[in-house]
UniProtKB/Swiss-Prot annotation:
This is Flavin-dependent thymidylate synthase. It catalyses: dUMP + (6R)-5,10-methylene-5,6,7,8-tetrahydrofolate + NADPH + H(+) = dTMP + (6S)-5,6,7,8-tetrahydrofolate + NADP(+). Binds 4 FAD per tetramer. Each FAD binding site is formed by three monomers. PANTHER family: FLAVIN-DEPENDENT THYMIDYLATE SYNTHASE. It comes from Mycolicibacterium paratuberculosis (strain ATCC BAA-968 / K-10). Keywords: FAD, Flavoprotein, Methyltransferase, NADP, Nucleotide biosynthesis, Transferase.
Length: 250
């Protein structure tokens, strides 16, 4: 029976910051948040922190977001390695064009033992999960049979790598949307804020909404001041959403 793949979002990279030694400025933050503040102050050369309300890094970033000076958020970035996500979900994810992606290739990686992602709505119903698993098993069996026959068909191809690639790219047509994929996603703070605003909404597909919430939790650990305006709430159906009165970019 097909193995179920749980969603997992792992932080694998984040911005470091090296303050120029000739600039008379210091801050109470480091990494991406410090870079954001530095970039903002560089615009006005306000190194002496003349405004008490923006003297701290958190205060400065709050002001940046309040006034809509979002461009300085683009200097800092975060990368996640995401597993336990369905192919159908990544089709929605990759529409966010300000992110950079590196995704598992079904042409190079065999899917004979691929896992499946249980769609929201089925995860609390064992009977429906059995139906899903049976369908996944059937499609995987068909995939395996096609793969073997296609490799035999392309036996005259002298390159073993090309032969396998040709077989896999044809056989994958029968794999379900629920097939697990794995993907590295990199985005700057502004792009991540936009993603959260769009995809953590109650109007978004539930799987990508869950992804957005998980990303938000990790982003809030990396750069609390940048994502502090988002609040996570639980709906009547038990799913979560995240909203912010300051996330106004469409």
């Amino acid at each position: 029976m097909a193995e179920i793949a749980p969603l997992r979002v792992q932080l694998i990279a984040k911005t470091d910051f090296l303050a120029p030694p000739d600039v008379p400025w210091s801050t109470d933050a480091d990494g991406g948040p410090a870079l954001v503040e530095f970039a903002g102050r560089a615009c006005y050369q306000s190194w002496s922190k003349p405004n008490p309300k923006t003297a701290t890094n958190a205060g400065y970033i709050k002001h940046i977001i309040d006034v809509g000076h979002f461009s300085v958020l683009e200097h800092a970035s975060v990368s996640f390695y995401i597993t336990g996500i369905s192919r159908s979900c990544t089709h929605e994810l990759i529409r966010h064009r300000h992110f950079s992606y590196s995704q598992l290739s079904q042409r190079y990686v065999p899917e004979n033992d691929s896992r499946v992602v249980v769609p929201p709505g089925l995860d609390d119903d064992p009977e429906l999960q059995q139906i899903l698993a049976a369908a996944a098993d059937a499609s995987r069996a068909t995939y395996t049979e096609l793969l073997a026959r296609l490799e035999a068909k392309f036996a005259d191809q002298p390159s073993a790598v090309l032969r396998r690639k040709q077989a896999r790219q044809a056989a994958r047509a029968v794999l379900p949307n629920a097939t697990e994929t794995r993907i590295v996603v990199t985005g700057n703070y502004r792009a991540w804020r936009h993603f959260i605003a769009m995809r953590a909404s109650e109007h978004a597909d539930v799987e990508i909404r869950r992804l957005a919430i998980e990303c938000l939790r990790r982003l809030a650990d990396v750069a609390p001041a940048v994502f502090a305006d988002f609040e996570i709430a639980t709906l009547a159906d038990g799913t979560e959403v995240a909203t912010s009165p300051l996330a106004t970019e469409a």
